[in-house]
């Protein structure tokens, strides 16, 4: 399920828009994730106390974590599928320490696409959305394979 060179170019063009404001995009992705799937908030001891969107928007820690998440994902996307070195430590921590299920990775993938679409509608049309969806699916599938190697049934 690889992506063509053209699809990777669409993904990386869209990601360039994200990188122009990683903290802002990351914060919005996490807020959208937590609002759409409140059960995901329980995985974040640091953010469990944030009950309203206003509290989430005011949290510098949430903004920082959003930036961390999107920076790591950006480093993976830039490898165009050749992301073994970047993926291994991420899968290790998410399987053994954080216990983040593949389903939660699907939820955050949806949030990422929704945020890019809402912030950059003119630059993130149907083809770019489909390409990003494929890239994030590749990421999730590879995370799931690593989880399996680690004995995590997430």
UniProtKB/Swiss-Prot annotation:
Chain positions found as Phosphoserine: 4
Subcellular location: Cytoplasm, Sarcoplasm
The entry's keywords: Cytoplasm, Heme, Iron, Metal-binding, Muscle protein, Oxidoreductase, Oxygen transport, Phosphoprotein, Transport
A GO-annotated cellular component: sarcoplasm
Lineage: Eukaryota, Metazoa, Chordata, Craniata, Vertebrata
Family listed: Belongs to the globin family.
Domain Globin span(s) in chain numbering: 2-148
PROSITE patterns: GLOBIN
Catalytic activity as recorded in UniProt: Fe(III)-heme b-[protein] + nitric oxide + H2O = Fe(II)-heme b-[protein] + nitrite + 2 H(+); H2O2 + AH2 = A + 2 H2O
Binding site for heme b: 94
Binding site for O2: 65
Organism, scientific name: Didelphis virginiana
Known function: Monomeric heme protein which primary function is to store oxygen and facilitate its diffusion within muscle tissues. Reversibly binds oxygen through a pentacoordinated heme iron and enables its timely and efficient release as needed during periods of heightened demand. Depending on the oxidative conditions of tissues and cells, and in addition to its ability to bind oxygen, it also has a nitrite reductase activity whereby it regulates the production of bioactive nitric oxide.
Record text on subunit structure and interactions: Monomeric.
The protein's name: Myoglobin
Keyword Transport: yes
Binding site for nitrite: 65
Residues the record lists as Phosphothreonine modifications: 68
Molecular function via GO: heme binding; metal ion binding; nitrite reductase activity; oxygen binding; oxygen carrier activity; peroxidase activity
UniProt keyword annotation of Transmembrane present: no
